[in-house]
Amino acid sequence: MTPFPPPLSGSAQDETPELRPRFDENGLIAAIAQDAGTGEVLMLAWMNAEALQKTIETGRATYWSRSRGALWVKGETSGHTQEVIELRVDCDQDAVLLKVRQTGGACHTHRESCFYRRIEGGVLSFTGKAD
């Protein structure tokens, strides 16, 4: 059971002052982590209701690992933590933006960002180095 009220219909969802996340059919919501200082997009992950609630309560980015089927506190094992500075939802509340203070690399490859490859003319080029 989710700790959040259900989403509203139509434009009422766009204008409500209440947090009413719209989780998908798997109970998940997209979560984008962005560096609060630079604005760089760091990663895309997923949250279920429990992960979102824990993030709100603790100020530490907590995600849902689809591969492990378990909660994942960013940096719990790697030390590469995300302190949440600001938390936002998009217009219809089906995506979350976490503005974070990142310690260490955000990517499991030890890069600052998971978005370290640029597509140019259908070819990938690397933009970031692993630590």
From Swiss-Prot:
Cofactor: how and how many bound: Binds 1 Mg(2+) ion per subunit.
Catalytic activity annotation: 1-(5-phospho-beta-D-ribosyl)-5'-AMP + H2O = 1-(5-phospho-beta-D-ribosyl)-5-[(5-phospho-beta-D-ribosylamino)methylideneamino]imidazole-4-carboxamide
EC identifiers of the protein: 3.5.4.19
Binding site for Mg(2+): D90, D92, D94
Pathway: Amino-acid biosynthesis; L-histidine biosynthesis; L-histidine from 5-phospho-alpha-D-ribose 1-diphosphate: step 3/9
List of residues binding Zn(2+): C91, C107, C114
InterPro entries hit by this protein: PRA-CH, PRib_AMP_CycHydrolase_dom, PRib_AMP_CycHydrolase_sf
Keyword terms, alphabetized: Amino-acid biosynthesis, Cytoplasm, Histidine biosynthesis, Hydrolase, Magnesium, Metal-binding, Zinc
CC annotations in GO: cytoplasm
One of the Pfam families matching this protein, by short name: PRA-CH
CC cofactor: Mg(2+); Zn(2+)
Subcellular location per the Swiss-Prot or TrEMBL entry: Cytoplasm
GO MF annotation, one: magnesium ion binding
One GO-annotated biological process of the protein: L-histidine biosynthetic process
Entry keyword Metal-binding: yes
Subunit structure: Homodimer.
Main function: Catalyzes the hydrolysis of the adenine ring of phosphoribosyl-AMP.
Family affiliation: Belongs to the PRA-CH family.
The protein's name in its UniProt record: Phosphoribosyl-AMP cyclohydrolase
Organism annotation: Hyphomonas neptunium (strain ATCC 15444)
Name of the gene encoding the protein in the UniProt record: hisI
